[in-house]
Amino acid sequence: DILAVYWLQKAVSNGETEAAQVLNRIAIRAKPASWAKTALQFLTRESVSSHPFLAARIELAAVFGLSRPEALLLDIHSADKGHCLLVDIREHYRRSKRKLILIQTGRERQTLSRIGRLFEKVDCGPNGPEGNYRQRQYRLKTLLPAPVPEHPEDTVS
């Protein structure tokens, strides 16, 4: 389906309306996650420098509309497919569903490339510097001064 998204995007750029309908069924468009946009407002220069990976994950969620589990567990290396973002955290979070998010703007591409460079030589798994899911959740909760509610549209279905 990743390759299909690529070719469907090509067809849409050539004016194929049927391809656009099929593309909308198998991939979603990026829309900001409200919890992450709120969380970005609480990030200070000190918190970004002390937790650069967490700050990058929050920014990624703000741009692509990731839920908290998706943002905290996403393997950045394998998620970037060039034309889309593959969000598949089922190995670590059983309740999640695999999804493809289209990369449509230059800003989305730049953000993903910059964050990809940050994570370039980093193990994104539980043995890496970020720790396991619980450690990442704790760090997120302690980094933000007040509880940032996750709205129903941001949750993993």
PLM region spans:
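Solenoid-like repeat scaffolds
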Residues: S13, L43-S49, H77-L85
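Active-site/catalytic core of tyrosine-dependent DNA strand-transfer enzymes
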Residues: Q104-S157
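Basic, Lys/Arg- and aromatic-enriched nucleic-acid-binding interface segment
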Residues: A20, A30-R68
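Short helix-capping/linker turns of helical repeat alpha-solenoids
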Residues: D1, N14-E18, V22-L23
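DNA breakage-rejoining catalytic core of tyrosine-based enzymes
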Residues: I26-L43, R95-R107
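Conserved tyrosine-mediated DNA breakage-rejoining catalytic core shared by Y-recombinases
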Residues: L73-T111
